[in-house]
Amino acid sequence: MATALVLGYSAFDLGLFSDKDPRLKLIKKAIRKDLEAMAADGVSWLVFTGSLGFEYWVLEVAQEMKTEYGFQLATIFAFETHGENWNEDNQMKLSRFKQVDFVKYAYPRYEHKGQLRDYQQFLLENTNSSYLFYDEENETKLAYFYQKMKNQEDYFIKRLTFDQLNELAENFSEN
């Protein structure tokens, strides 16, 4: 059973502040294409951390594909307090992360930075691959986690990059 951890840029990192942004259609098209390939490679579980942006968009697409491709979806939040201060729209998105096949919380609340390190290690040890929207040339807080993934033995990383999106956009506009 192949399990992929889903991580990537936040909507804020990408400057996408509206669910109606036309760039989302292209991003979701790339996600669908990648998820189809991952399903063909045997990925059956997608594991989320509950972040808005790329993770949420993958969740939306995976839920659309769930019946046809048999995906199982899990959200493992770092803390039970995750998202409690979010606005109403984001609370609705958070509720979708909680309406999956498996939901757990690593800790009741944040107490010290060691919890995040242990949480990341737990995620790496309990998945055997990742689906990551991350480009080393556009670093964010994911840089440390990405490095840990690369150092993890026998850990497959499927990346979506800006170059791939640009190529898809060029092909999309030609058709």
From Swiss-Prot:
SUPFAM superfamilies tied to this protein: MCP/YpsA-like (SSF102405)
Domain of life: Bacteria
Pfam families: YpsA
UniProt similarity note: Belongs to the UPF0398 family.
Record-linked HAMAP family: UPF0398
Record protein name field: UPF0398 protein SPH_0478
Source organism per UniProt: Streptococcus pneumoniae (strain Hungary19A-6)
